[in-house]
Amino acid sequence: MENLAELPSPWFVYLVRCANNALYCGITTDVSRRFAQHQKGRGAKALRGKGPLELVWSLPVADGKSAALKLEYRIKALSKSQKEALVAGMARIDQLEIIFQ
């Protein structure tokens, strides 16, 4: 049995809604910690002064940081309406895979 301390931290891709209704996409190993950083102005520079912020979507990524970075890149390439469909639960990442090919 593996030692739990040796297991890698799971990665997450997340979307934050800004006051101007824009969606920011990022990755982290701890969504609540990262969102708290964004709210305090210590996260991404792109979100500073854009509050109030709302965490609207997150997804665990099983295959580590590299896979999370690739998914983040793909989500950032989606249109606003496609991102909104993810947030609303009307679309799943696997349904959008056609767009990524």
Swiss-Prot record:
UniProt family annotation: Belongs to the UPF0213 family.
UniProt-listed PANTHER family: UPF0213 PROTEIN YHBQ (PTHR34477:SF1)
Protein name listed in UniProt: UPF0213 protein VC_A0739
Taxonomic source organism: Vibrio cholerae serotype O1 (strain ATCC 39315 / El Tor Inaba N16961)
InterPro entries recorded: GIY-YIG_endonuc (IPR000305), GIY-YIG_endonuc_sf (IPR035901), UPF0213_domain (IPR050190)
Domain GIY-YIG: 9-85
SUPFAM superfamilies: GIY-YIG endonuclease
